[in-house]
């Protein structure tokens, strides 16, 4: 991989700046963006049956040991759709990834335990690890988070001293 310049370690930023910033640079930032966008697309696709094949998804949730509640299926679908779109756009990446990491932890703990198999014990844990990485790394390249990090930067760090 690249040198030590591929990972940023800065503590002189505000919590808001750190929330919207990315820890990675260069090729690692590009790879992180590819991971972010690809997993965002996966979650958007996973959300659709929760709305379009709701009764089937509800029966699956019951099979996984969850309560017989349409609200749970709709909430999970809304989380996957909303957070998946956030990942694709690269906005609020850490927050979206945290919500989806909790979702995947729940999927492994329910469907993984009740059903098992390569999907629930392979894909779901891989998505969980991907989300944990995005919580740590941030959005990578080509993300709206980067523009927001710049917007929230103190004026001195943006090169504006306030005088002409």
Label the predicted regions.
Residues 1-52, 71-78, 82, 89-164:
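Extended, low-polarity transmembrane helix blocks
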Residues 54-65, 82-90:
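Short juxtamembrane and helix-loop transition motifs at transmembrane-helix boundaries
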Residues 61-75:
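Structural signature of hydrophobic alpha-helical transmembrane segments
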């Amino acid at each position: 991989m690249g040198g030590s310049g591929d990972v940023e370690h800065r503590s002189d930023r505000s919590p808001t700046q750190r929330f919207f910033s990315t820890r990675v640079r260069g090729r690692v930032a590009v790879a992180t963006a590819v991971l972010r966008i690809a997993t965002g697309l996966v979650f958007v696709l996973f959300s659709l049956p929760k709305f379009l094949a709701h009764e089937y998804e509800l029966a699956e949730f019951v099979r996984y040991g969850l309560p017989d509640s349409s609200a749970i299926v709709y909430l999970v679908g809304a989380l996957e759709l909303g957070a998946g779109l956030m990942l694709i756009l690269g906005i609020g990446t850490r927050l979206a990834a945290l919500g989806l990491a909790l979702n995947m932890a729940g999927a492994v703990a329910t469907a993984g335990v009740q059903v098992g198999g390569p999907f629930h014990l392979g894909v779901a844990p891989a998505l969980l690890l991907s989300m944990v990485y995005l919580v740590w790394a941030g959005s990578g390249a080509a993300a709206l988070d980067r523009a927001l990090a710049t917007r929230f930067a103190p004026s001195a760090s943006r090169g504006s001293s306030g005088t002409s």
